[in-house]
């Protein structure tokens, strides 16, 4: 059966905020958390008008009158001050300058190493033999123990020339010989021999052409 045109369907009336006006309070409600009176009534996002929603400016929290407390903080905090930005920028600049100084210090180390290598090279090239390096660490230029150009006969229990308590008396051939190089021991000639009596090693020098 068709409905009559004059008959209208009942429409549902949406609740409005006029039915629940905000409470007229002489003084704002204190915050239930911090007891601060810097609170306000929330006109927006106040879905349950039977429990009006409030906001505390001190602790930045919402709460509903007659409801439970919410521990959810307000999103989107305040902007950072310019002083904090300047402080962070200065800290970054200081760290970058310190890192550059460290790099500068490390680049100066190879120069010192090259100088020491050059010094050692000059010492080797100046003496001209490996035996000269043995006397670099001694206090008297290698004259104590015969590690350099010195003879060191007494310190090594060999004795000077003319001392008969040792046994074989080495005779150095010439005036420029080293401790380990002698020219003649008891008639042995034509080569170089070690000066120690128990470690006599002869090195024959044959004229090979």
From Swiss-Prot:
<dbReference type="GO" id="GO:0003700">
    <property type="term" value="F:DNA-binding transcription factor activity"/>
</dbReference>
<dbReference type="InterPro" id="IPR003851">
    <property type="entry name" value="Znf_Dof"/>
</dbReference>
<dbReference type="GO" id="GO:0006355">
    <property type="term" value="P:regulation of DNA-templated transcription"/>
</dbReference>
<keyword id="KW-0539">Nucleus</keyword>
<keyword id="KW-0804">Transcription</keyword>
<feature type="region of interest" description="Disordered">
    <location>
        <begin position="70"/>
        <end position="116"/>
    </location>
</feature>
<dbReference type="Pfam" id="PF02701">
    <property type="entry name" value="Zn_ribbon_Dof"/>
</dbReference>
<dbReference type="GO" id="GO:0003677">
    <property type="term" value="F:DNA binding"/>
</dbReference>
<feature type="region of interest" description="Disordered">
    <location>
        <begin position="1"/>
        <end position="29"/>
    </location>
</feature>
<dbReference type="InterPro" id="IPR045174">
    <property type="entry name" value="Dof"/>
</dbReference>
<feature type="compositionally biased region" description="Pro residues">
    <location>
        <begin position="20"/>
        <end position="29"/>
    </location>
</feature>
<feature type="binding site">
    <location>
        <position position="59"/>
    </location>
    <ligand>
        <name>Zn(2+)</name>
    </ligand>
</feature>
<comment type="function">
    <text>Transcription factor that binds specifically to a 5'-AA[AG]G-3' consensus core sequence.</text>
</comment>
<keyword id="KW-0238">DNA-binding</keyword>
<dbReference type="GO" id="GO:0005634">
    <property type="term" value="C:nucleus"/>
</dbReference>
<feature type="compositionally biased region" description="Polar residues">
    <location>
        <begin position="1"/>
        <end position="17"/>
    </location>
</feature>
<keyword id="KW-0863">Zinc-finger</keyword>
<protein>
    <recommendedName>
        <fullName>Dof zinc finger protein DOF1.6</fullName>
    </recommendedName>
</protein>
<feature type="compositionally biased region" description="Low complexity">
    <location>
        <begin position="89"/>
        <end position="116"/>
    </location>
</feature>
<feature type="binding site">
    <location>
        <position position="31"/>
    </location>
    <ligand>
        <name>Zn(2+)</name>
    </ligand>
</feature>
<feature type="zinc finger region" description="Dof-type">
    <location>
        <begin position="29"/>
        <end position="83"/>
    </location>
</feature>
<keyword id="KW-0862">Zinc</keyword>
<keyword id="KW-0479">Metal-binding</keyword>
<dbReference type="GO" id="GO:0008270">
    <property type="term" value="F:zinc ion binding"/>
</dbReference>
<feature type="binding site">
    <location>
        <position position="34"/>
    </location>
    <ligand>
        <name>Zn(2+)</name>
    </ligand>
</feature>
<keyword id="KW-0805">Transcription regulation</keyword>
<feature type="binding site">
    <location>
        <position position="56"/>
    </location>
    <ligand>
        <name>Zn(2+)</name>
    </ligand>
</feature>
């Amino acid at each position: 059966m068709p409905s009559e045109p004059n008959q209208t369907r009942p429409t549902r009336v949406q609740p409005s905020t006029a039915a629940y006006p905000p409470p007229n309070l002489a003084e704002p409600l204190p915050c239930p958390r911090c007891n601060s009176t810097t609170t306000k009534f929330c006109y927006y996002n106040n879905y349950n008008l039977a429990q009006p929603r409030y906001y505390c400016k001190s602790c930045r929290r919402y709460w509903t009158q007659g409801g439970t407390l919410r521990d959810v903080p307000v999103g989107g905090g305040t902007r950072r001050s310019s002083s904090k930005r300047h402080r962070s920028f200065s800290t970054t600049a200081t760290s970058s300058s310190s890192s550059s100084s460290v790099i500068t210090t490390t680049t100066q180390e190879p120069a010192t190493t090259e100088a020491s290598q050059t010094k050692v090279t000059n010492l080797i090239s100046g003496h001209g033999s490996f035996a000269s390096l043995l006397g670099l660490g001694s206090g008297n230029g290698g004259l104590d123990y015969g590690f350099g150009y010195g003879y060191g006969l007494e310190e090594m229990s060999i004795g000077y020339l003319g001392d008969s308590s040792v046994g074989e008396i080495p005779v150095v051939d010439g005036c420029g010989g080293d401790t380990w190089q002698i020219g003649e021991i008891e008639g042995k000639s034509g080569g170089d021999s070690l000066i120690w009596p128990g470690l006599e090693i002869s090195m024959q020098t044959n004229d090979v052409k």
